[in-house]
Amino acid sequence: YVASVADSVFIHPMGEMMWFGLASQNFYLKDALAKWGIEPQIIRHGKYKSAVEPFMENEMSMANHEQTMTYLSSMWNYTINAVSAARQISTEELNMFAEGRVAFLPKQAQEVGLVDGIYYADQMDSVLLVKTGRKIDDKLRTVSLYNYSHYVQQQESLDLSAKKIALVYAVGEINDGDEDDSAIGGDAYAEIFSQLRKDSTIKAVVLRVNSPGGSAFASEVMWRELTRLREKKPLIVSMGTYAASGGYYISAPADYIVTSPLTLTGSIGVFGMYMTYGKLLREKLSVYPRVVKTHSHSDIGSVMRPLDEFEKELM
């Protein structure tokens, strides 16, 4: 898919090209957990909120199968249409390759138009010299991806104007509290949005969201500050690979939301889950928890026992 946009695509003589469609796989753990006496306590709203489904069932639900097939088909159709346009191969042929051929040796890939040539690595210098109109004995000048990206970053860091557009990256799961390297801390980001709202040199904000969601509370904290920010200046959200659940929640206040054609977004709903280990301790390890409490539900949420019906309704 990525290679197809190139003017020319080459493959090593001992290479292989694979073309086999898309798949999504998950493991369902209901019986495995029961075997060990582990009881998941799950509260879920929304039949398409499927993240907790593997802990509840042994089979995929119809709703989850439907949504998974929908987004896989959407991604696949976009991919083959793009490849078809770039390589001048019909979508029917590309689907046939995925269904019946799957693997292509170099000659086969060239015959059907997936590649343009077959070369060893040492032959590529000569190919590139010819492609760029140079003499075959000239030295090929190249730049590494690292050096090129470093140069671009240096150019982007130039501060040339008193009027600025702020770019904020919100990447990772959404957690309560402060930011860390792999998560979006609700309090930390709310403070960033507050500062941007107050900064008169910032004329607009672009929020790049790449998040599967997380804490509903942290999402609400950020949503509030983003709503206040939008009242003062334009707010644009750019979605990355995914902006699901809380990731969509924090995107909602934007004046405009922009996605890539393959962004996965939605998953609007809530769930809560924790495991209880009372049966594991009693029946497998001969450990017997005992509790003393002042009221019937003083130990609600204990990992030693499941929720009762009243507590489930409360949740």
For the regions a language model picked out, list residue spans one by one.
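Terminal amphipathic helices with adjacent charged low-complexity linkers/tails
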Residues: 117, 125-131
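Short, contiguous alpha-helical
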Residues: 109
